[in-house]
Amino acid sequence: MNDSSKPLTQRRHLLTVGAAVAAALAGAGAAYWQSKQEQAETPRMPITGDLDELWQMQFDKPDGGKLAMQSLKGKPLLINFWATWCPPCVEELPLLERFYNQNKAKSMQIVGLAADKPEAVRTFLKKLPLTFPIGITDLSGIALSKSWGNLAGGLPFSVMLAADGHVMQRKMGKLSEDDLNIWQNAV
């Protein structure tokens, strides 16, 4: 290598390193932005679905019969939309089960609305039995959740109703124990 090619080689090396650093910074910035977006609670927006209609709804129960939403009216109610094919939904169900068992005597209610096929829900509940009420909505549950503020139509999606039926909280994404405690204290 002659002396005249050394500066060119050094310049290429510096450009390569500079490009790598810029790419790393851009990637880190994008990852940070995405993590903040995922942590953000569902934006507040008016609910287009008529909550009065909610109390008239009935859903098939996994073991047969109907889950009448009217039977849950008048107490704080957490409605959780989930599906057996949704990993975050499945991960949060044991937390919801624990929370339900700790709080059912305190008039706190939970209902799970499975946006799934009835047979898939029945099979799933044999492996992970739940004691809080479950209704099966098929895929129409996703449209229902959208009318209550689930802009993306993603699962899991949870809505917390006060005893008088007004919406207190909403979240698209997996609930945490902190979420549940905050929501419970708000009612």
Residue ranges of predicted features:
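N-terminal targeting signals for export/organelle localization
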Residues: 1-56
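Conserved hydrophobic/aromatic "anchor" residues
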Residues: 57, 81-82, 124, 132
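Active-site acidic short loop of glycosyltransferases
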Residues: 72-75, 105, 131, 153
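Aromatic-flanked redox-active Cys/Sec active sites in thiol-based oxidoreductases
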Residues: 80-86, 115
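C-type cytochrome heme c attachment motif
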Residues: 84-91, 157
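Structural microenvironment flanking redox-active thiols in thiol-disulfide oxidoreductases
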Residues: 91-129, 139-145
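Thiol/disulfide oxidoreductase modules built on the thioredoxin-like
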Residues: 127-130, 138-185
